[in-house]
């Protein structure tokens, strides 16, 4: 059942960085919405698609990646550093508590950009036989070609180009 243009008040951020609001049948999860925002969303069951931000969170910042919201790798790039760190710390605290562990959590090291040391690049050949390399689009199997990723650690900066070159060599040799 799709409800077009539902007005929602986002209550909190979920574990995957999506905005969460309680609906009549449980939680509704809206990617790219932040806690405290009033949004307009298309709702289908427990999923929402952000259509418009009616009232933005004061914690909202501009995304620093040109692929944000296209590539499926980043969920909370629009959240300012201090609330981002608080959200990440609360995720860790909840996980430890759930496991029955008590531990003091040290402040996070700022890696809200340029800190990712691992990435999975996907590749396939297109209908012309050329390699298409990049990250998967959010909630799909479509590959989004990228030239760079500002979240990668400096030592990983050349990884997209290297992955693309390797995929092209494999495609040229007939490997799939």
Regions found by a protein language model. Give the residues of each.
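Accessory RNA-recognition modules of RNA-modification enzymes
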Residues: 1-176
